[in-house]
């Protein structure tokens, strides 16, 4: 699951209102496919992992799938991931966190179980939920996750006495802040 979480982070900043999700396929104790949700409107992590698996010449049937968020079970910009998992013959799905989106909310897990797929929930759950705190906030409130940053001088000012604009922080600090805002 930790590898799936690492992969999920690669999508941060590109998925807009969608969650960041990573997926890893394991068969006979070796990784046979990996994927993550790369961009809004693109393939979800599960489908990316299945495509990667097949591109390696591997067969996903009977494999275990580790995914940081419950697979979707509805049609949106892409078909349901549960459908792809079922059709691939995955035998066991390990889920990090339940998707609280009302379009999913446990239904993805239920669909997999109804098809005879073993599902283990809550693997590194707190970490997976934290990874998608921005997504969960948006789903629960329909409001953006707001984070603010400002710089000030040692005496608490944000501009010179004349009001003239000038940099308060150095270039390295500005770069660091830019990167930290992407990786909330």
Predicted features, each with a name:
Residues 17-21, 43, 144-146:
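Short, basic and Ser/Thr-rich N-terminal targeting/leader segments
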Residues 34:
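Short glycine-/small-residue motifs
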Residues 38, 68, 96:
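Conserved residues at the C-terminal ends of beta-strands
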Residues 39-51, 168-175:
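A short, polar/charged loop-to-alpha-helix boundary motif
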Residues 50-75:
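Mobile, glycine- and charge-enriched loop segments
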Residues 21-26, 150-151:
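Short beta-strand scaffold segments in enzyme catalytic cores
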Residues 1-15, 31, 61, 75-182:
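Zinc-dependent deaminase
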